[in-house]
Each structure stands twice: as C-alpha cells, then as structure tokens.
C-alpha cells in the first residue's frame, strides 16, 4: 500500500543487484526498500567551522531499522574512536540525539567522523556501501571538516 504516484519508479527503490555509478536501471529491476541501515549525522558544528581553541562540542542524530546501540566519533581518520552520549528516542520511530566533547591534540585541520552501531552489531561503513540512482541506503560514516586554531 502506498499513497500515490510519488511511490512509483525509483522512489524508495534500489537496484536488485550491484550496478556501476551512472547505470540506468530498468524500473522492473528496482526493489522497494524495506529496511533502514544504521546511520548517524553530525549536525553541529557545521563543516568548515574555524575554532579558536581545541575543545570541540559535537551534536548529531542517529537512526536505524531497529535500536541504535552506540555512536562513536573520531578526529584522526578512524584510528581511534570516542563513545558519544546517546539519548533515548522519544518513540520507536524517532531519531536519537547524540553528543560528545573531544579535545583536539593541536591546531590544524581535522575531519570529525561519526559512526553508529545498531543492536544487531551492524556498523556504518567507512566507504560508500554501493551506488544507486537516488542514493538510498548510503549509510557511510559521516564526516565534517574543522580547523582548530
């Protein structure tokens, strides 16, 4: 059951098999998404932020098909991870909020990464999980750039 024409064609559908970027996939080879992969997004600070100090407060949202078990953040390209504080969702369909404070070791450029893990042990991948025409299901580790002063 769906609510009209916006649910046709490629809407909420992914290729039934792996395809190369840019490939035209026939509508009959598309399948409806039935699950939501675990995902987190950093919502603050904005990418490109220039800081005066080395202490960074991070906030964001996370979701999954089921419950999210944890969110971790990294400032060293995933070499080390720090657990973020994860708030309980307001209901079973709501995004969860997370926050963390990290100390950057010195002035310079940093990529801050967030990575969520669900209760089944599925974790966001560091690389793109696979191309599809609308980008559905892209749950790659989220990154922002900051410049610490």
Regions found by a protein language model. Give the residues of each.
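Extended, aromatic/histidine-rich regions of cofactor-dependent oxidoreductases associated
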Residues: 1-149
């Amino acid at each position: 059951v769906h609510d009209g024409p916006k649910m046709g064609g490629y809407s909420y559908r992914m290729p039934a098999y792996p395809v190369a970027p840019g490939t035209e996939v026939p509508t009959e080879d598309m399948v409806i998404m039935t699950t939501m992969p675990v995902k987190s997004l950093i919502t603050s600070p904005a990418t490109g932020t220039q800081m005066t100090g080395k202490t960074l407060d991070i906030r964001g949202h996370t979701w999954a098909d089921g419950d999210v078990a944890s969110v971790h953040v990294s400032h060293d390209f995933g070499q080390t991870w720090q657990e973020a504080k994860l708030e309980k969702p307001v209901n079973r369909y709501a995004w969860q909020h997370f926050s963390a404070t990290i100390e950057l070791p010195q002035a310079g450029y940093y990529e801050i990464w967030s990575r969520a893990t669900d209760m089944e042990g599925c974790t966001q991948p560091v690389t793109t999980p696979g191309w599809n025409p609308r980008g559905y299901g892209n749950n790659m580790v989220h990154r922002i750039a900051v410049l610490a002063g």
